[in-house]
Protein backbone atom coordinates (compact mmCIF):
# COMPACT_ATOMS: atom_id res chain seq x y z
CA UNK A 1 0.00 0.00 0.00
CA UNK A 2 1.25 3.50 -0.86
CA UNK A 3 2.40 5.74 1.96
CA UNK A 4 0.24 8.57 3.29
CA UNK A 5 2.57 11.12 1.72
CA UNK A 6 2.31 9.45 -1.71
CA UNK A 7 -1.48 9.25 -1.47
CA UNK A 8 -1.76 12.92 -0.49
CA UNK A 9 0.47 13.84 -3.44
CA UNK A 10 -1.65 11.75 -5.83
CA UNK A 11 -4.89 13.25 -4.53
CA UNK A 12 -3.58 16.79 -4.99
CA UNK A 13 -2.37 16.00 -8.53
CA UNK A 14 -5.74 14.53 -9.52
CA UNK A 15 -7.56 17.52 -8.00
CA UNK A 16 -5.39 19.87 -10.06
CA UNK A 17 -6.19 17.91 -13.22
CA UNK A 18 -9.90 18.02 -12.36
CA UNK A 19 -9.73 21.82 -12.07
CA UNK A 20 -8.19 22.05 -15.55
CA UNK A 21 -10.69 19.69 -17.18
CA UNK A 22 -13.59 21.44 -15.44
CA UNK A 23 -12.38 24.80 -16.77
CA UNK A 24 -12.00 23.36 -20.27
CA UNK A 25 -15.52 21.96 -20.04
CA UNK A 26 -16.90 25.37 -19.09
CA UNK A 27 -15.09 27.11 -21.96
CA UNK A 28 -16.21 24.44 -24.43
CA UNK A 29 -19.81 24.77 -23.22
CA UNK A 30 -19.82 28.49 -24.05
CA UNK A 31 -18.26 27.90 -27.47
CA UNK A 32 -20.61 25.00 -28.13
CA UNK A 33 -23.73 27.07 -27.55
CA UNK A 34 -22.49 29.67 -30.03
CA UNK A 35 -21.51 27.03 -32.61
CA UNK A 36 -24.82 25.19 -32.25
CA UNK A 37 -26.75 28.41 -32.86
CA UNK A 38 -24.72 29.08 -36.02
CA UNK A 39 -25.48 25.59 -37.33
CA UNK A 40 -29.20 26.05 -36.80
CA UNK A 41 -29.10 29.44 -38.52
CA UNK A 42 -27.14 28.18 -41.53
CA UNK A 43 -29.10 25.00 -42.25
CA UNK A 44 -32.14 26.74 -43.82
CA UNK A 45 -29.84 28.70 -46.16
CA UNK A 46 -28.05 25.54 -47.28
CA UNK A 47 -31.38 23.77 -47.82
CA UNK A 48 -32.72 26.68 -49.90
CA UNK A 49 -29.52 26.72 -51.95
CA UNK A 50 -30.07 23.05 -52.76
CA UNK A 51 -33.65 23.82 -53.81
CA UNK A 52 -32.41 26.54 -56.16
CA UNK A 53 -29.78 24.19 -57.57
CA UNK A 54 -32.40 21.52 -58.20
CA UNK A 55 -34.62 24.01 -60.00
CA UNK A 56 -31.85 25.33 -62.23
CA UNK A 57 -30.32 21.90 -62.87
CA UNK A 58 -33.69 20.65 -64.12
CA UNK A 59 -33.65 23.35 -66.83
CA UNK A 60 -29.97 23.26 -67.73
CA UNK A 61 -28.30 21.15 -70.37
CA UNK A 62 -26.06 18.27 -69.36
CA UNK A 63 -23.02 19.62 -71.26
CA UNK A 64 -21.54 21.31 -68.19
CA UNK A 65 -19.08 18.83 -66.59
CA UNK A 66 -19.49 20.60 -63.22
CA UNK A 67 -23.07 19.34 -63.25
CA UNK A 68 -23.07 16.22 -65.42
CA UNK A 69 -19.57 14.99 -64.64
CA UNK A 70 -16.89 13.58 -66.92
CA UNK A 71 -17.08 10.34 -68.83
CA UNK A 72 -14.03 8.84 -67.15
CA UNK A 73 -13.12 9.29 -63.47
CA UNK A 74 -9.37 8.94 -63.20
CA UNK A 75 -8.78 10.89 -60.00
CA UNK A 76 -10.96 12.00 -57.08
CA UNK A 77 -10.24 14.75 -54.57
CA UNK A 78 -11.13 13.99 -50.95
CA UNK A 79 -11.30 16.95 -48.54
CA UNK A 80 -11.36 16.02 -44.84
CA UNK A 81 -12.38 18.41 -42.06
CA UNK A 82 -10.73 17.85 -38.66
CA UNK A 83 -9.94 20.08 -35.67
CA UNK A 84 -6.84 22.13 -34.92
CA UNK A 85 -6.77 21.01 -31.27
CA UNK A 86 -7.23 17.72 -29.47
CA UNK A 87 -8.91 16.75 -26.18
CA UNK A 88 -12.15 16.05 -28.04
CA UNK A 89 -12.51 12.29 -27.68
CA UNK A 90 -12.89 10.28 -30.89
CA UNK A 91 -13.98 13.32 -32.93
CA UNK A 92 -10.94 13.32 -35.22
CA UNK A 93 -10.30 9.59 -35.18
CA UNK A 94 -13.72 8.69 -36.55
CA UNK A 95 -13.65 11.14 -39.45
CA UNK A 96 -10.11 10.10 -40.36
CA UNK A 97 -11.10 6.41 -40.29
CA UNK A 98 -14.02 7.25 -42.56
CA UNK A 99 -11.64 9.05 -44.92
CA UNK A 100 -9.20 6.14 -45.08
CA UNK A 101 -12.04 3.70 -45.73
CA UNK A 102 -13.50 5.93 -48.46
CA UNK A 103 -10.10 6.30 -50.15
CA UNK A 104 -9.65 2.54 -50.16
CA UNK A 105 -13.07 2.08 -51.78
CA UNK A 106 -12.25 4.32 -54.74
CA UNK A 107 -11.29 2.72 -58.01
CA UNK A 108 -9.49 5.91 -59.01
CA UNK A 109 -6.45 7.68 -57.61
CA UNK A 110 -7.29 9.78 -54.54
CA UNK A 111 -6.04 13.34 -54.14
CA UNK A 112 -6.12 14.41 -50.48
CA UNK A 113 -7.04 17.83 -49.07
CA UNK A 114 -7.01 18.44 -45.30
CA UNK A 115 -8.45 21.10 -43.02
CA UNK A 116 -7.33 21.17 -39.38
CA UNK A 117 -3.91 20.51 -37.86
CA UNK A 118 -4.93 17.07 -36.57
CA UNK A 119 -5.83 15.90 -40.06
CA UNK A 120 -2.72 17.45 -41.61
CA UNK A 121 -0.49 15.70 -39.05
CA UNK A 122 -2.31 12.40 -39.61
CA UNK A 123 -1.82 12.39 -43.38
CA UNK A 124 1.79 13.53 -43.14
CA UNK A 125 2.53 10.77 -40.64
CA UNK A 126 1.07 8.26 -43.10
CA UNK A 127 3.05 9.91 -45.90
CA UNK A 128 -0.07 10.79 -47.85
CA UNK A 129 0.65 13.87 -49.94
CA UNK A 130 -1.66 16.85 -49.55
CA UNK A 131 -2.82 18.80 -52.58
CA UNK A 132 -3.97 21.60 -50.25
CA UNK A 133 -4.13 22.16 -46.50
CA UNK A 134 -5.92 24.67 -44.28
CA UNK A 135 -5.68 25.33 -40.53
CA UNK A 136 -6.07 27.90 -37.78
CA UNK A 137 -9.83 28.43 -37.85
CA UNK A 138 -11.61 25.12 -37.23
CA UNK A 139 -13.13 26.02 -33.85
CA UNK A 140 -14.57 29.33 -35.12
CA UNK A 141 -14.74 29.28 -38.95
CA UNK A 142 -15.79 32.26 -41.06
CA UNK A 143 -17.44 32.30 -44.47
CA UNK A 144 -14.13 33.52 -45.91
CA UNK A 145 -12.56 30.24 -44.74
CA UNK A 146 -15.30 28.32 -46.56
CA UNK A 147 -14.67 30.41 -49.68
CA UNK A 148 -10.95 29.62 -49.63
CA UNK A 149 -11.58 25.89 -49.33
CA UNK A 150 -14.47 25.90 -51.80
CA UNK A 151 -12.55 27.84 -54.43
CA UNK A 152 -9.53 25.60 -53.99
CA UNK A 153 -11.64 22.47 -54.52
CA UNK A 154 -13.41 24.03 -57.51
CA UNK A 155 -10.02 24.85 -59.07
CA UNK A 156 -8.94 21.23 -58.75
CA UNK A 157 -12.02 20.21 -60.73
CA UNK A 158 -11.80 22.99 -63.34
CA UNK A 159 -8.13 22.24 -64.04
CA UNK A 160 -9.02 18.55 -64.41
CA UNK A 161 -6.69 17.64 -61.56
CA UNK A 162 -9.72 15.85 -60.08
CA UNK A 163 -12.76 14.42 -61.86
CA UNK A 164 -14.85 14.23 -58.70
CA UNK A 165 -14.61 16.14 -55.41
CA UNK A 166 -15.82 14.78 -52.07
CA UNK A 167 -16.05 16.28 -48.60
CA UNK A 168 -15.68 14.17 -45.42
CA UNK A 169 -16.69 15.73 -42.12
CA UNK A 170 -18.46 15.14 -38.81
CA UNK A 171 -22.14 16.06 -39.06
CA UNK A 172 -23.39 17.43 -35.75
CA UNK A 173 -26.18 15.41 -34.11
CA UNK A 174 -25.87 16.35 -30.42
CA UNK A 175 -23.02 17.13 -28.00
CA UNK A 176 -22.23 13.45 -27.54
CA UNK A 177 -22.81 12.26 -31.13
CA UNK A 178 -21.11 13.39 -34.33
CA UNK A 179 -21.68 11.30 -37.44
CA UNK A 180 -18.91 11.14 -40.09
CA UNK A 181 -20.40 11.60 -43.56
CA UNK A 182 -19.17 11.79 -47.16
CA UNK A 183 -20.74 14.39 -49.47
CA UNK A 184 -20.02 14.81 -53.18
CA UNK A 185 -19.38 18.44 -54.05
CA UNK A 186 -18.53 18.11 -57.75
CA UNK A 187 -20.06 17.24 -60.11
CA UNK A 188 -22.81 19.23 -58.39
CA UNK A 189 -25.94 17.08 -58.51
CA UNK A 190 -28.29 17.84 -55.60
CA UNK A 191 -30.68 15.07 -54.63
CA UNK A 192 -33.79 15.25 -56.76
CA UNK A 193 -32.03 17.41 -59.32
CA UNK A 194 -32.57 15.14 -62.30
CA UNK A 195 -33.68 16.68 -65.56
CA UNK A 196 -37.43 17.04 -66.00
CA UNK A 197 -38.43 17.76 -62.42
CA UNK A 198 -39.41 21.35 -63.23
CA UNK A 199 -37.89 24.71 -62.30
CA UNK A 200 -39.56 25.45 -59.01
CA UNK A 201 -38.34 26.61 -55.64
CA UNK A 202 -40.73 25.84 -52.78
CA UNK A 203 -43.52 25.40 -55.32
CA UNK A 204 -42.90 28.71 -57.17
CA UNK A 205 -42.06 28.49 -60.94
CA UNK A 206 -39.10 30.52 -62.22
CA UNK A 207 -37.87 31.72 -65.61
CA UNK A 208 -34.09 31.91 -65.86
CA UNK A 209 -32.55 34.93 -67.62
CA UNK A 210 -30.42 34.83 -69.71
CA UNK A 211 -30.64 31.04 -69.39
CA UNK A 212 -30.21 28.23 -66.86
CA UNK A 213 -26.74 27.24 -68.13
CA UNK A 214 -25.31 30.74 -67.67
CA UNK A 215 -26.74 31.03 -64.18
CA UNK A 216 -25.53 27.56 -63.32
CA UNK A 217 -21.93 28.35 -64.26
CA UNK A 218 -21.92 31.19 -61.74
CA UNK A 219 -24.01 29.44 -59.11
CA UNK A 220 -22.10 26.15 -58.83
CA UNK A 221 -18.98 27.69 -57.18
CA UNK A 222 -21.25 29.46 -54.67
CA UNK A 223 -23.12 26.20 -54.13
CA UNK A 224 -19.83 24.43 -53.32
CA UNK A 225 -18.84 27.23 -50.92
CA UNK A 226 -22.23 26.95 -49.19
CA UNK A 227 -21.84 23.20 -48.65
CA UNK A 228 -18.30 23.71 -47.32
CA UNK A 229 -19.56 26.50 -45.03
CA UNK A 230 -22.30 24.29 -43.64
CA UNK A 231 -19.80 21.45 -43.13
CA UNK A 232 -17.36 23.75 -41.30
CA UNK A 233 -20.12 24.90 -38.95
CA UNK A 234 -21.30 21.33 -38.34
CA UNK A 235 -17.72 20.24 -37.67
CA UNK A 236 -17.08 23.16 -35.27
CA UNK A 237 -20.24 22.43 -33.28
CA UNK A 238 -19.32 18.75 -33.17
CA UNK A 239 -15.78 19.57 -32.02
CA UNK A 240 -16.94 21.75 -29.13
CA UNK A 241 -19.65 19.26 -28.18
CA UNK A 242 -17.15 16.40 -28.23
CA UNK A 243 -14.62 18.37 -26.17
CA UNK A 244 -17.29 19.41 -23.67
CA UNK A 245 -18.39 15.79 -23.29
CA UNK A 246 -14.82 14.50 -23.05
CA UNK A 247 -13.86 17.06 -20.41
CA UNK A 248 -17.00 16.33 -18.39
CA UNK A 249 -16.16 12.62 -18.43
CA UNK A 250 -12.56 13.40 -17.47
CA UNK A 251 -13.71 15.59 -14.57
CA UNK A 252 -16.15 12.94 -13.35
CA UNK A 253 -13.45 10.27 -13.55
CA UNK A 254 -11.00 12.50 -11.69
CA UNK A 255 -13.51 13.12 -8.91
CA UNK A 256 -14.17 9.39 -8.62
CA UNK A 257 -10.44 8.76 -8.44
CA UNK A 258 -10.10 11.40 -5.69
CA UNK A 259 -12.81 9.61 -3.70
CA UNK A 260 -11.05 6.26 -4.17
CA UNK A 261 -7.66 7.66 -3.18
CA UNK A 262 -9.18 9.48 -0.19
CA UNK A 263 -10.69 6.20 1.00
CA UNK A 264 -7.31 4.51 0.63
CA UNK A 265 -5.65 7.36 2.53
CA UNK A 266 -8.18 7.12 5.37
CA UNK A 267 -7.65 3.37 5.59
CA UNK A 268 -3.88 3.87 5.61
CA UNK A 269 -4.18 6.55 8.31
CA UNK A 270 -6.44 4.28 10.38
CA UNK A 271 -4.00 1.41 10.02
CA UNK A 272 -1.14 3.68 11.05
CA UNK A 273 -3.02 4.90 14.13
CA UNK A 274 -3.96 1.33 15.08
CA UNK A 275 -0.34 0.28 14.68
CA UNK A 276 0.91 3.17 16.82
CA UNK A 277 -1.66 2.42 19.55
CA UNK A 278 -0.63 -1.24 19.50
CA UNK A 279 3.02 -0.25 19.82
CA UNK A 280 2.25 2.11 22.74
CA UNK A 281 0.17 -0.57 24.48
CA UNK A 282 2.91 -3.14 23.97
CA UNK A 283 5.49 -0.71 25.37
CA UNK A 284 3.32 0.01 28.40
CA UNK A 285 2.88 -3.70 29.08
CA UNK A 286 6.61 -4.22 28.80
CA UNK A 287 7.29 -1.43 31.29
CA UNK A 288 4.68 -2.77 33.69
CA UNK A 289 6.13 -6.25 33.45
CA UNK A 290 9.64 -4.93 34.02
Swiss-Prot record:
PANTHER family: ATP SYNTHASE GAMMA CHAIN, ATP SYNTHASE SUBUNIT GAMMA, MITOCHONDRIAL. Produces ATP from ADP in the presence of a proton gradient across the membrane. The gamma chain is believed to be important in regulating ATPase activity and the flow of protons through the CF(0) complex. Keywords: ATP synthesis, Cell membrane, CF(1), Hydrogen ion transport, Ion transport, Membrane, Transport. It comes from Rubrobacter xylanophilus (strain DSM 9941 / JCM 11954 / NBRC 16129 / PRD-1). Its main location: membrane. CDD domains: F1-ATPase_gamma. F-type ATPases have 2 components, CF(1) - the catalytic core - and CF(0) - the membrane proton channel. CF(1) has five subunits: alpha(3), beta(3), gamma(1), delta(1), epsilon(1). CF(0) has three main subunits: a, b and c. Disulfide bonds: none annotated. Coiled coil: none annotated. The gene is atpG. This is ATP synthase gamma chain. GO terms for molecular function: ATP binding; proton-transporting ATP synthase activity, rotational mechanism. InterPro entries: ATP_synth_F1_ATPase_gsu, ATP_synth_F1_gsu, ATP_synth_F1_gsu_CS. GO terms for biological process: proton motive force-driven plasma membrane ATP synthesis. GO terms for cellular component: plasma membrane; proton-transporting ATP synthase complex. It is found in: Cell membrane.
